[in-house]
Amino acid sequence: MVDPSGDPGERGAAGHTVLIAGATSAAGVAVAVALAGAGARVLAVGSNEKRLERVLEAVPECSVYVCDLTDFAAVTALAATVHAEHGPVDGLVHLVGGWRGGGGLDGQTDEDWDFLHTRVLQTLRNTTRAFNADLLASFTGRLAIVSSVSVDAPTPGGANYASAKAAAETWTRAVGHGFAKAGDTAAAVIFAVRSLEGLEPRLAAEVVALWDSPAASLNNTRRILAP
């Protein structure tokens, strides 16, 4: 039985149900492989069925779901399906993202902002709202997102992107404050990178390690991953 103190003890990620939102990227596949290797039940979610097949090739034992994570009704339906098939989740790893930018401040178009706001922030809002009760109910609930160091030093050409990531970090910290008010069993963690390319294995290892430490030592921390 998992320790209700929020300390996973020696079990780590084993036996936990972890949903990866945006699982079809290289980072998503790496995280899925690492979690499955650690004994977790992996639920891979993406918007493209063909790309989800690649996740299944890498992790045959995982369960895959096609969902438009920008649509809250679709996400709540996903949550209902997940609960019916697997019960509540213990972890949510949000990897939905994308890049739009360049051209200085004048190049920060409304179209690019809408794209970034929808993918980076709206999908995070939707998934955390749909699965927040699960993470609070779990003795070892974990939320992880990937942000950018550009939040710390934004440039005119990356203003849209940095703003969307900053908003995602703020949302995540708000979720973390909710976790803290409810007790010491759930944690929200931000991983910040300059570029995720080449860091996928490192990110995967860091995500798995979230179940190796007590929630109180992890909650609302921000970790910079560098090459």
What are these regions (language model features)?
Residues 1-20, 215-217:
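Flexible N-terminal pre-Rossmann segment of NAD(P)-dependent oxidoreductases
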Residues 58-73:
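Rossmann-fold cofactor-recognition segment
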